[in-house]
């Protein structure tokens, strides 16, 4: 097999893996429904480019109809290449809207020198995007956070916030007006890096947060990448833990009635047997990698009727 052919096979495998991971997340959390108008938030980074690209693929083949509109928030950062995103979006034929709001000056004016900008920037950006979604009549807002972002958020909340809290794949906004979805929830960041190289997306760096090397999130990200190299399967196992929560073996009295426990009650989640060691799944213990399209990360849930986004569109007569 030639080097070129081998690379083509690897690229096809990567594309299939990403498509299936996104499709599985959409199916598991019922992210997209018939007739949805989805606002895809496009920052110019690798993650949001990949999100839009994969959603377009699914839109073309899915058994349901839904609309996509790309939205970019031009925060008036110095040197921001305003022409890059419109040129790209017009070249692929995606409807889009560029929202111009000078949040850059606001963040720089309000925060002291040396302070991290992410929290304030995120709040300002979120409010503008919610307003834009309402103006466009969008039913869903799609963000480009991936699996590693979700895990990093969990550790940030544990280490610095004292909460066992991550980043939900799907949520309702605080005002109750918007459904926010994260279709990349099952996707590895390292796969997105490879995909961006394959697709040659015109990446735009962020001058606000990209220039702050000591951000807590970046430190956590470095920790996760180090673990992924030294302990194959650890990241997958941690994400699986987010989907297999046992409230009776934590310490939150709001989630479980510890005070009401009495002798003779039915065992809850195995009782003290839950402390016994369990056999580690082979793909976690030996570091081997399987075809991601065959791995079902989510635990088995109650039967419910969902539309498989990975299925094909129904054929029409005469097609």
From Swiss-Prot:
It catalyses: cytidine(32) in tRNA + S-sulfanyl-L-cysteinyl-[cysteine desulfurase] + AH2 + ATP = 2-thiocytidine(32) in tRNA + L-cysteinyl-[cysteine desulfurase] + A + AMP + diphosphate + H(+). The keyword Phosphoprotein does not apply. Keywords: 4Fe-4S, ATP-binding, Cytoplasm, Iron, Iron-sulfur, Magnesium, Metal-binding, Nucleotide-binding, RNA-binding, Transferase, tRNA processing, tRNA-binding. It is found in: Cytoplasm. Its EC number is 2.8.1.-. InterPro entries: Rossmann-like_a/b/a_fold, TilS/TtcA_N, tRNA_Cyd_32_2_STrfase, tRNA_thiolation_TtcA_Ctu1. It comes from the Bacteria. Binds 1 [4Fe-4S] cluster per subunit. The cluster is chelated by three Cys residues, the fourth Fe has a free coordination site that may bind a sulfur atom transferred from the persulfide of IscS. GO terms for molecular function: 4 iron, 4 sulfur cluster binding; ATP binding; magnesium ion binding; sulfurtransferase activity; tRNA binding. One of its GO terms (cellular component) is cytoplasm. Its main location: cytoplasm. [4Fe-4S] cluster binds at residues 118, 121, 209. One of its GO terms (biological process) is tRNA thio-modification. A motif (PP-loop motif) lies at residues 43-48. The thiolation reaction likely consists of two steps: a first activation step by ATP to form an adenylated intermediate of the target base of tRNA, and a second nucleophilic substitution step of the sulfur (S) atom supplied by the hydrosulfide attached to the Fe-S cluster. NCBIfam families: PRK10696.1. Belongs to the TtcA family. Catalyzes the ATP-dependent 2-thiolation of cytidine in position 32 of tRNA, to form 2-thiocytidine (s(2)C32). The sulfur atoms are provided by the cysteine/cysteine desulfurase (IscS) system. This is tRNA-cytidine(32) 2-sulfurtransferase. The gene is ttcA.
